[in-house]
Amino acid sequence: MNLPYPIILASQSPRRRELLALTLLPFETMSVNTPETLNPTLSPEENVLAIAHEKADAVATILAHTKRQAIVLTADTMVAQGRHIFGKPSGFDEAFSMLQHLQGKTHQVHTGFTLRTPTINHSEYVTTHVTLNAMSSEAIAHYLHQQQPYDKAGSYGIQDPLMACHISSINGCYYNVVGLPLSRVWLALQAIIAQQ
């Protein structure tokens, strides 16, 4: 794939860096601090898109000052059941409560992403349905003590040791649950290159 500009992944997530590296495309990372505030009037899908846009706007401002051109990739992932959003937990108690709520049920993982060049602004979201097995309080506590997934939406990482034992089914893109829907990002990159 011949890129017209370098790719900048605007993310602090090590998982997103690992996933984008699977494409074998060269990229650099940039950290941007944005509020990532949820809008209660928006759906989870609309919220992830809004936050991805907000991050892309922040990077665009930085690039405008340096007169750099790039393909900017931003993303945001949320775990939800219907309109109820499960963010990143503040600690053990909140994480325990989230997993108690999610266990034995199906929930949705939404990732919104934005790809932006000087002339193109592409955004979309991807949804994956995940069902967790019933988990005892002991199993939840053991997982939390072992993995401490406090930096993850919904209080779990699908790729974590132990969590694999509790995933009953996945309907949709696995990589979306990890944090970046690679196949959709790849297709969007191809479309952007075709338009240059």
From Swiss-Prot:
Its cofactor is a divalent metal cation. The record marks R15, T77, Q159 as: Important for substrate specificity. Gene3D superfamilies: 3.90.950.10. It catalyses: dTTP + H2O = dTMP + diphosphate + H(+); UTP + H2O = UMP + diphosphate + H(+). Its main location: cytoplasm. One of its GO terms (cellular component) is cytoplasm. The keyword Cytoplasm applies. The active site is at D76 (proton acceptor). It is found in: Cytoplasm. It comes from the Bacteria. It is an enzyme of class 3 (hydrolase). Its EC number is 3.6.1.9. InterPro entries: ITPase-like_fam (IPR029001), Maf-like (IPR003697). CDD domains: Maf. Keywords: Cytoplasm, Hydrolase, Nucleotide metabolism. GO terms for molecular function: dTTP diphosphatase activity; UTP diphosphatase activity. The keyword Hydrolase applies. Nucleoside triphosphate pyrophosphatase that hydrolyzes dTTP and UTP. May have a dual role in cell division arrest and in preventing the incorporation of modified nucleotides into cellular nucleic acids. PANTHER family: BIFUNCTIONAL DTTP/UTP PYROPHOSPHATASE/METHYLTRANSFERASE PROTEIN-RELATED, BIFUNCTIONAL DTTP_UTP PYROPHOSPHATASE_METHYLTRANSFERASE PROTEIN-RELATED. This is dTTP/UTP pyrophosphatase. The lineage of its organism: Bacteria, Pseudomonadati, Chlorobiota, Chlorobiia, Chlorobiales.
